[in-house]
Amino acid sequence: MVTMKDLLECGVHFGHQTRRWNPKMKPFIFGVRKNIHIIDLQKTLRYFRYTYNIVRDAAKEGKTILFVGTKKQAKNAIEEYAKKCGMPYVNSRWLGGTLTNFNTIKKSIRKLEIIEEMEKTGQMDLLTKKEALMLRRKKEKLENFLGGIRDMKGLPDMLFIIDAVREHIAVKEGNKLGIPIVAPLDTNCDPDLIDYPIPGNDDAIRSIQLFCKEMAEAIIEGKELREQELEGEEQEEAAPATEEEKKELIEEAVAEGEAEETEEEEK
């Protein structure tokens, strides 16, 4: 789990210039240095560890956490760590309605699957050069926008967002649908919009990588706990009876039968 040393080394404490702050973030600000707000890392650590447990427990329950981060500094980390923990992600442009109009998104994903099927079966070779070219361009566009969520069968149970200000549409859609949101909150953010905030720098690459890494580790830990529980249940169900158990059961049945016979005789 994250330590104070990790936070300091990754520059999680550096906020925005003081003129760009959101006054609602005041409780999370330690001070000012060279016109830059400094985030209180004691609070960051506390919120970080609390949120880690929330995300771990969600994964333990089999829930889906959608990773979102489309800006340059976040794209690679979002994809890398979402894949590492087996969760869907959006690291290209957020398409309006990704959540609130998910049925339309599913139709677009279906189009991507159809094009891939046409390529696999050789049907693409039967088209004109122009038709094949247009379909391949469409495939590239669909992969770019939807590749990370193509296996997401329904709405996610939770969102993990890097830069809640930039991803305001995703935040708005999540809030509208009542989907809990986890997000690092820089000093320009509105904490009221985020269910599980972690005060911290959401611009520096190392800071973003730390947030993504910790959330991925929480999910992996939760999944492992889930597997252990399921394996335990299966073992309980499938465990063959021991000879001792059989013997006890026979003795129990005989004793019960004899007791019933005695009662009948007394009547």
Swiss-Prot record:
Keywords of the record: Ribonucleoprotein, Ribosomal protein
Presence of keyword Ribosomal protein: yes
InterPro entries: Ribosomal_uS2, Ribosomal_uS2_bac/mit/plastid, Ribosomal_uS2_CS, Ribosomal_uS2_flav_dom_sf
One CC-aspect GO term: cytosolic small ribosomal subunit
One GO MF term attached to the UniProt entry: structural constituent of ribosome
Biased composition (Acidic residues): 251-267
Region annotated Disordered, chain positions: 225-267
Pfam families according to UniProt: Ribosomal_S2
A Gene Ontology BP annotation from the UniProt entry: translation
Family, similarity comment: Belongs to the universal ribosomal protein uS2 family.
NCBIfam families: rpsB_bact
Name of the protein in its database record: Small ribosomal subunit protein uS2
Species this protein is from: Nitratiruptor sp. (strain SB155-2)
Gene name of the encoded protein: rpsB
